[in-house]
Amino acid sequence: MTNIRKSHPLIKIVNHSFIDLPTPPNISAWWNFGSLLGVCLVLQILTGLFLAMHYTSDTMTAFSSVTHICRDVNYGWIIRYMHANGASMFFICLYMHVGRGMYYGSYTFSETWNIGIMLLLTVMATAFMGYVLPWGQMSFWGATVITNLLSAIPYIGTNLVEWIWGGFSVDKATLTRFFAFHFILPFIISALAAVHLLFLHETGSNNPSGITSDSDKIPFHPYYMIKDILGLLMLILMLTLLVLFSPDLLGDPDNYIPANPLNTPPHIKPEWYFLFAYAILRSIPNKLGGVLALMFSILILAIIPIFHTSKQRGMMFRPLSQCLFWLLVADLLTLTWIGGQPVEHPFITIGQLASILYFSTLLVLMPISGIIENRLLKW
């Protein structure tokens, strides 16, 4: 008699993906973030569903409906803060996951990598629209500023912005459609994540050494199931501490003021996880140039495989590239800090230098270091 998990059409898929999956024996904790992202996605969908039961997407009542959730709904405050801070955890895991892919050369799985970029862009769009929904000052002005960037597109820009707004300014139509998209996009993300996994399991996971491990694989369960549960417990601990002790740590105080189109906040800025891209946008004085730099700061990930010059896959045995990678991480942290600062000296100059360093590291320095390391191998 055959085992049901190996013969049943549906359970068989789960078995091949999470139980009997052949996995390299040497993958480190950096490979935990994929499963953590799956957990974050499920958490966001569940908390979001309960929030949507009480939220109203109308400009007159949106702000008070969020207040009502926090004050009057049973455990509404914890659901709201788990959703808001869950997004921060989601992005921490997402950036770690992308960083691991860059460090260990996982971008050589081109289909998996490209679907990952699509996932990143979709999650960013979803998070942006979610930030607009509470209809506080930063929600309103953030939506106005970011959507207005599309007006930089020649010829069709202004019409495109008004089409997205559903009028001549950010108003009821904008809020309603943002809520509709914010509700549907996580399910599209789930479908993309399934395709991401499908392509990954076609090739098998990469590993720290970057060389094939087909001859020496172990089953995912129980070895990596236990390892992933440790990462999951750490994630839950961090999220719980954040939600219960300082739920507003990563938020903006201006968002506790109801949206007022007649009063602009002194510093308009997005959530912390978009600040690096916002800093790159602000560092270019020209509007169209800034928008292009903003787009390219994310889309540059798609051309990383083309600029891979090293004979080795990962950076485990490439000290020059390792130095450049950590320089890039420090640069992104600097950009994140600059994005939250006012537009004045010396922050403008620091932002411009950090933006130049970001693009030059990825497009010039890393390919050159790969060539130098290839030469060093011949010595």
Curated annotation (Swiss-Prot):
Family, similarity comment: Belongs to the cytochrome b family.
GO biological process, one term: mitochondrial electron transport, ubiquinol to cytochrome c
Binding site for heme b b566: H97, H196
Quaternary structure and partners: The cytochrome bc1 complex contains 11 subunits: 3 respiratory subunits (MT-CYB, CYC1 and UQCRFS1), 2 core proteins (UQCRC1 and UQCRC2) and 6 low-molecular weight proteins (UQCRH/QCR6, UQCRB/QCR7, UQCRQ/QCR8, UQCR10/QCR9, UQCR11/QCR10 and a cleavage product of UQCRFS1). This cytochrome bc1 complex then forms a dimer.
InterPro entries, per database record: Cyt_b/b6_C (IPR005798), Cyt_b/b6_C_sf (IPR036150), Cyt_b/b6_N (IPR005797), Cytb/b6-like_sf (IPR027387), Cytochrome_b (IPR030689), Cytochrome_b_C_euk/bac (IPR048260), Cytochrome_b_N_euk/bac (IPR048259), Di-haem_cyt_TM (IPR016174)
Annotated function: Component of the ubiquinol-cytochrome c reductase complex (complex III or cytochrome b-c1 complex) that is part of the mitochondrial respiratory chain. The b-c1 complex mediates electron transfer from ubiquinol to cytochrome c. Contributes to the generation of a proton gradient across the mitochondrial membrane that is then used for ATP synthesis.
Origin species: Acinonyx jubatus
Protein name in the entry: Cytochrome b
Cofactor: binding comment: Binds 2 heme b groups non-covalently.
Subcellular location field: Mitochondrion inner membrane
Lineage of the organism: Eukaryota, Metazoa, Chordata, Craniata, Vertebrata
Residues that, per the record, bind heme b b562: H83, H182
GO molecular function: metal ion binding; ubiquinol-cytochrome-c reductase activity
One family name in Pfam for this protein: Cytochrome_B
Anything else known: Heme 1 (or BL or b562) is low-potential and absorbs at about 562 nm, and heme 2 (or BH or b566) is high-potential and absorbs at about 566 nm.
